[in-house]
Amino acid sequence: MNGIINVLKPAGMTSFDVVSHLRRVAGQKKIGHTGTLDPSAVGVLPICLGSATRAIEFIIDKDKVYRAELTLGSATDTQDSSGNVIFSGRVDADENRIAEVIMSFVGETDQLPPMYSAIKIDGKKLYQLARQGETVERQPRKITIYDIRILRIWEATERLPGNVAGSVPQPEVQVKKALFEVHCSKGTYIRTLCHDIGEKIGCGGHMSFLIRTRAGRYDLDSALTLEEIKKLALNKELESRLISAETVFDDFESIHLSEKEAFKYNNGVWLKINYQKDDTNPFIRVYDYNNIFLGIGEIFNNGQDTCLKSKKFFIKD
């Protein structure tokens, strides 16, 4: 099978767990996910099968939309509600101040990746080091928050995350919460955004809920639950529900090749072409003379001519 399944990831599963599950259900060896979604989070997780796995890097590069709940009054070691409290403070900020601080994160900024993340340093994932009690130096990464839409801010009484000595539940405390929608670039950690908001207010904060509502062009409306996917597979209907990898590149310009050009292109030959390309994106959808999608090409100048070379082939496996 070749194509994309837009999965509605449930809470409690890692992105790799979802891939392993679908590998068994679909009987598919060549399969991969398009970017880690926290185990506690739910939402859109496009999974690529067969030749569509060549589109993974392009989907990862797309912007994302999340809906998150921020709890103010405590910070945790994981920056979400699964961790233990490392700082707690009284929330004196009113609704206007909270909203002001949240909105101050809109724009391009440097974000320090959390220790509890899948980023690798010297071959080891950060979360593996964190579980061993280690903290290592990380470099901030450029991210962009395109927009934040605050949906609600309210007060609540709840127990702090984690346990105190002897596994005794934490006491109940007064907290403030904010529910907001954020549109951001790839590589943005919403947990870290919540942590940083709490730090800027001065009371500590952590992410208490997260749902990814969109990854690139794939949204909740087209997402399938694992139960739905299993039923489709049992009924031999899953392949008919796969989304073409071509859809990943809907916003790319396109070019059609003659029979002679297509033959050369498919054999890795650079083609001299007469084409005025958008400088902001060197990549282009390539079709043959029968309007069959061949893959993604790259437009470049060799010093004399405008040329086309293959970047990714999407001829079905």
What are these regions (language model features)?
Residues 47, 68, 123, 193, ...:
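Residue-level signal for inorganic ion chemistry
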Residues 1-10, 14-33, 37, 41, ...:
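Accessory RNA 3′-end/elbow-binding domains used by RNA modification enzymes
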Residues 24-28, 46, 136-202:
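The conserved catalytic core of RNA pseudouridine synthases
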Residues 58-113:
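Acidic, low-complexity central loop/insert segments
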Residues 117, 121-140, 145:
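Extended alpha-helical targeting/anchoring segments
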Residues 57-72, 136-150:
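Structural signature of FAD isoalloxazine-binding scaffolds in flavoprotein oxidoreductases
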Residues 30-60, 128, 132:
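Glycine/acidic-rich beta-strand-loop module
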